[in-house]
Amino acid sequence: MKMNFVEPWRGRRAAMRKLAGSVVLVAGRALAQRDAFGGAAPACVLTPRQTEGPYFVDERLQRADIRSDPSNGTLRSGVPLALVMRIAALSGGRCEPVTGAIVDVWHCDAAGVYSDVDDASLRTKGTAFLRGYQLTDAHGQVRFTTIYPGAYRGRAVHIHFKVRTNRGDRATEFTSQLYFDDRLTDRVHERPPYAGRASRRTRNGDDALFRAGGRSLIVDARQDGEGYAAAYDVGLRGA
């Protein structure tokens, strides 16, 4: 069934907490409420930053469909994933859309490989598959077409994201990661091109990064044809 993101989302409510520093940045899942997505904004749920990891590359590659490698046009194979994120600013107890924010996403392919990396384990320098950024629209939304991430030793299945804004004379940056329910990943990774590869060794609860706030970073995902549609809210708050 095709998913329409202009619907109520389901999620969990958490208590708001303040972060130290001149700028407070928060990220959170959408809450169960009657407001339609794109209408009244949900309350923000505070979750921790997470590391950008060793494989962030500031490609400055603006595109919605990140499946291809710009160097040769080839698509990375995998189960389709439509990812929608909404960026909002907490103001007066409401999350108002943030327009013009740069939202980068990057993740590994079905084999657990990142693009544009040259280290002891990966030799993909010069490629840029599964990387890109979008600017938030009038509703604070960005949409990406990608594939469901693969797995590699030591990490739960995840997508990295970075939000950069320039509000007045103050630039802010928030970096974190998105996760998936283990049961969903189990189903997806039974399908090609994931199936037949080394078994997924690290589940969410076995990943130290996930244990540091990852439960509130799990996307809301639903089946969408042959693939999945996933949604997540991120909020920014000024002190």
For the regions a language model picked out, list residue spans one by one.
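Exposed beta-sheet edge/beta-hairpin loop segments within beta-rich domains
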Residues: G150-Y152, D220-G225
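Low-complexity, intrinsically disordered Gly/Pro/Thr-rich segments
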Residues: L209-Q223
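N-terminal secretory signal peptides
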Residues: M1-A14, L19-A27
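Aromatic- and glycine-enriched pocket-lining scaffold segments that form the walls
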Residues: Y228
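Beta-strand-dominated extracellular/periplasmic modules and repeats
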Residues: F37-A212, A231, G235-A239
